[in-house]
Amino acid sequence: MSAKPEVGLVREASRQIVAGGSAGLVEICLMHPLDVVKTRFQIQRCATDPNSYKSLVDSFRMIFQTERLFGFYKGILPPILAETPKRAVKFFTFEQYKKLLGYVSLSPALTFTIAGLGSGLTEAIVVNPFEVVKVGLQANRNTFAKQPSTVGYARQIIKKEGWGLQGLNKGLTATLGRHGVFNMVYFGFYYNVKNMIPVNKDPTLEFLRKFGIGLLSGTIASVINIPFDVAKSRIQGPQPVPGEIKYRTCFKTMATVYQEEGILALYKGLLPKIMRLGPGGAVMLLVYEYTYSWLQENW
């Protein structure tokens, strides 16, 4: 009798891993070029720098001219490798936190929001080492052929700085803030608004309903969490003076950026981030939901 719930849980987790991995892979392949542009904007510090990008269009033009097409896919391997466990953690833990919060007298709106926060914090712990490698590779402006491999770069970090908070887990507090805040808003907004708007019987209109809510969820979450994202990129990216660590902790980095560069510097890369995580967030939710629904019917 006790074996049935265990089998059910294993099957449910397996479905979420497959559906979440599919959602992550599709989103990464479609949206990664915008992530490269976003990271480049966030790590540049001075408009007078001859290597700085003047606009979104200018960044695309310069990257293509100097690094060619593959320049837009720098650092793509770490997020691809991380997507299956990351999305599995994201969606599976969200459901588990939601079930756990069901034992507490909370409103559905608060339940979705807190469950999203919990899933984001858990996700951040899993994904942070991959983010450290990804940001380092994206910050490299050499041609694709001249940059180190993903594994080679990870080995360099481990050899020089180790596995800890100065090495492969550098910027963990900022990553916790970035993912915790994003998932809190992303899941909280999506499921609350989706439950408020009636389901449409027409499949096309229903698809558009979900896509529109997902688009808004990703956009709003991106606007709210981007200061954490900027702090993460500064901590994990190249430091202004080689060998001297300027950016260490999340909130101290935010304060330094604000004092030296102004409030708008905390929103660097917002446009490419919204362009990526607005539609990307919608794509991810829809791919996950439709894949998971198909797996429920066929497996």
Swiss-Prot record:
Keyword ATP-binding recorded: no
Xref: Gene3D superfamilies: Mitochondrial carrier domain
Main location as per UniProt: mitochondrion
GO biological process: lipid transport
Subcellular location: Mitochondrion inner membrane
UniProtKB keywords: Antiport, Lipid transport, Membrane, Mitochondrion, Mitochondrion inner membrane, Repeat, Transmembrane, Transmembrane helix, Transport
Gene Ontology CC: mitochondrial inner membrane
Superkingdom per UniProt: Eukaryota
Reaction(s) the record says it catalyses: 2-oxoadipate(in) + 2-oxoglutarate(out) = 2-oxoadipate(out) + 2-oxoglutarate(in); hexanedioate(in) + 2-oxoglutarate(out) = hexanedioate(out) + 2-oxoglutarate(in); L-2-aminoadipate(in) + 2-oxoglutarate(out) = L-2-aminoadipate(out) + 2-oxoglutarate(in); glutarate(in) + 2-oxoglutarate(out) = glutarate(out) + 2-oxoglutarate(in)
Residues annotated as transmembrane: 17-37, 70-89, 113-133, 167-187, 205-225, 277-297
Solcar repeats: 11-100, 107-196, 205-294
Main function: Transports dicarboxylates across the inner membranes of mitochondria by a counter-exchange mechanism. Can transport 2-oxoadipate (2-oxohexanedioate), 2-oxoglutarate, adipate (hexanedioate), glutarate, and to a lesser extent, pimelate (heptanedioate), 2-oxopimelate (2-oxoheptanedioate), 2-aminoadipate (2-aminohexanedioate), oxaloacetate, and citrate.
Similarity section: Belongs to the mitochondrial carrier (TC 2.A.29) family.
Name of the protein in its database record: Mitochondrial 2-oxodicarboxylate carrier
UniProt organism field: Pongo abelii
Gene designation: SLC25A21
